[in-house]
Amino acid sequence: MGRALRADAERSVRAILEAAERVLAQDAGASMEQIAEAAGLTRITVHRRFANRQALLEALAVSAKQQLVDAIEEARPDAAPALVALYRVTANVLRVKETWRFTLSHATAHTEAATALWAEIDAHTVDLLTRAQREGLLAADADLDWTRQVYYALLSEALNRPGADQDPAAQDPEVLATLVIDTLLHGAGPHG
């Protein structure tokens, strides 16, 4: 019985978080009641899982960042050459960023758990960029902290390209990953 209750609680938390992402993306000031309605749950159920709006925002931040970590690890970056790994990680991360667009693009609560997950994301990214540098994809004297910042900016900008909403194919994570990696490694200069 306890296991069924736990599974039910996990499902309702997941439904609340997914509904919160959708609702808050449309209206950042949405109420807990609106989120509950979108999740198909009562307001009391939402409040049972999250004491207040801040607790819900904190859970959103942790959930989205955990999904980024999972996406990076799913790409198995150590099992392929740096270029292949960078492409896989980028495509996976773009999928998560598209799904959690509100949470990952807004300043969310920086709990200890969210901060630890962000440190893990940074560590994975720096490890991958270090491998890319060792394999000659990045200049030997490239500043990897700056390169990491540029990479993160490219990820965000790829999802927010002007006119992308008119061309759904342009939002395909595989297409965007190619764009991000090509821009990161070659900039806007000639490719020859």
Question: Which residue ranges define each predicted feature?
Answer:
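Basic, helix-initiating cap at the start of DNA-binding domains
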Residues: 1-38, 55-58, 63
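Amphipathic, non-transmembrane alpha-helical scaffold segments
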Residues: 9, 61, 65, 114-122
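C-terminal peripheral helix-coil segments that are non-catalytic and often amphipathic
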Residues: 88, 123, 127-135, 153, ...
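Short hydrophobic/aromatic patch on the recognition helix
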Residues: 40-50
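Solvent-exposed, amphipathic alpha-helical segments
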Residues: 19-26, 67-78, 96, 150-161
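Hydrophobic alpha-helical connector segments
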Residues: 59, 70-98, 109-114
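Short secondary-structure transition hinges
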Residues: 55, 95-127, 137
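All-alpha amphipathic helical-bundle segments outside canonical DNA-binding/catalytic cores
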Residues: 84, 116-117, 134-151, 171-176
